[in-house]
């Protein structure tokens, strides 16, 4: 079962005056797509999905970033009363259509423009409910602990489940420091009675839009406005000044260095050959300053580029995985061309092979529970993740010693190995590691 729409970005609904800007914003994540994938509601999206044969089950979170952008574009102004009413209408419609929760991307435009009070107001339809709010927090670098405290405030106020997405502390100065403190905060909040938990991907590198390295205030107005700013000498100088010293945003190049940021999903003839090279390498090859190389690349690509960024510490990943309230995720995006992150193909295999079999940080039963029942229950999917009378017969058969990830950052599109058989709804879709051609996947709605 795949659950999409995380980090505030979902593909539906996608209609209205601001829809073209949202489509452009999603392009580094989804690849470019046409009108045939623009739906007026999540129900319409699900209906189209059900007309398409699916290998796996699919559920969807309602992306609050998509919904806010449909209401107010990428403006940084506080929402008006009327805009909040329209946002609540869209949230309630998506939940009624079967979304298994909502997601936030507080590190991204336009959600980075919320105050804490505005965020709580935006989430009012979730108050006292059972559906979770998943959140890419406002910061994951120097301000990550304060960002977690903000979300604990939200959880206390709304009394709904809150899932901290891909918990980490970005940057060497935060490794081994921020994560232990955050795990203590989560433990204390759970003891207080808050329904808070977290997840983590089993890699030290992440992947998202390349514009995420820029100060958020320059992202107001959407990608067209940002592209224009990247071509303006005054705006470039202001961006550089903020990136050289700023700690009040997720300043990735400052935290980990240009050598640890790798652009992907490049499309122009000028920059496509540099895909897979770090920003430091690209700057050196072009004879440019790293900031100029970054700004020129983004402007040429009209900001529709992605990145792989090496940001986290293995010791922190292991500490999070050991926590009883954590689960592993892929956090994968699925670009239709070019390089992708190896987690697209190998997350579960890497978790089982590296962290369980080789590192021994969890027993196999503990690991399987996290991958199955614990994850399903968090999203209210009561017929998934268990072997029981009345449950769906979705089963994976494997020998632990044979599981392995085959992908690498330079060659990510490699299927993992060791899954002997996979049954979806009781029908074999993989036998002896080979696809059978069956397509028993279904759309899953909250119930």
Spans of features found by a protein language model:
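Short acidic, glycine/serine/threonine-rich loops at helix termini
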Residues: 7-19, 69-75, 116, 145-149, ...
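Active-site neighborhoods of metal-dependent hydrolases
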Residues: 46-49, 54-81, 85-108, 153-156, ...
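Divalent metal-binding pocket/active-site signature
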Residues: 93-151
């Amino acid at each position: 079962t795949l659950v999409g729409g995380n980090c505030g970005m979902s593909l539906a609904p996608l209609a209205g005056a601001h829809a073209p800007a949202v489509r452009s914003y999603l392009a580094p994540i989804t690849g470019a797509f046409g009108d045939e994938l623009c739906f007026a509601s999540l129900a319409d999206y699900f209906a189209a999905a059900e007309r398409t044969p699916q290998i796996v089950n699919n559920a969807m979170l309602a992306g609050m970033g998509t919904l806010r952008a449909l209401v107010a574009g990428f403006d940084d102004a506080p929402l008006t009363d009327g805009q909040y009413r329209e946002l609540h209408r869209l949230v309630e419609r998506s939940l009624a259509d079967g979304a298994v929760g909502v997601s936030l991307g507080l590190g991204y435009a336009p959600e980075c423009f919320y105050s804490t009070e505005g965020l709580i107001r935006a989430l009012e339809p979730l108050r006292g409910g059972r559906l979770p709010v998943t959140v890419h927090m406002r910061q994951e670098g120097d301000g990550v602990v304060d960002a977690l405290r903000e979300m604990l405030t939200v959880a206390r106020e709304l009394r709904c489940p809150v899932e901290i997405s891909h918990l980490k502390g970005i940057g060497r100065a935060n490794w081994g420091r921020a994560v232990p403190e955050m795990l203590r905060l989560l433990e204390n909040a759970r003891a207080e009675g808050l329904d808070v938990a977290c997840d983590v991907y089993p890699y030290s590198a992440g992947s998202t839009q390349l514009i995420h390295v820029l100060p958020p205030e320059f992202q107001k107005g959407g990608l067209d406005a940002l592209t224009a700013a990247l071509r303006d000498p005054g705006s470039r100088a202001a961006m550089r000044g903020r990136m050289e010293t700023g700690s009040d945003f997720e300043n990735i190049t400052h935290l980990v260095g240009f050598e640890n940021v790798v652009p992907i999903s490049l499309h122009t003839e000028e920059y496509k050959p540099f895909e897979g090279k770090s920003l430091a390498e690209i700057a050196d090859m072009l004879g440019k300053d790293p900031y100029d190389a970054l700004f020129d690349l983004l402007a040429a690509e009209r900001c529709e580029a992605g990145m792989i960024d090496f940001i986290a510490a293995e010791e922190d990943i292991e500490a999070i995985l050991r926590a009883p309230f954590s689960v592993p995720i892929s956090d994968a995006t699925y670009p239709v061309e070019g390089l992708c992150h190896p987690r697209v193909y190998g997350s579960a295999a890497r978790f089982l092979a590296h962290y369980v079999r080789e590192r021994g940080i969890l027993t196999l039963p503990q690991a399987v529970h996290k991958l199955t029942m614990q994850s399903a229950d968090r999203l209210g999917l009561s017929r998934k993740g268990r072997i029981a009378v009345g449950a769906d017969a979705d089963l994976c058969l494997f020998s632990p010693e044979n599981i392995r990830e085959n992908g690498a950052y330079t060659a990510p599109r490699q299927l993992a190995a060791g899954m002997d058989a996979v049954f979806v709804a009781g029908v074999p879709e993989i036998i002896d590691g080979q696809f059978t051609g069956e397509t028993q996947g279904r759309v899953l709605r909250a119930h």
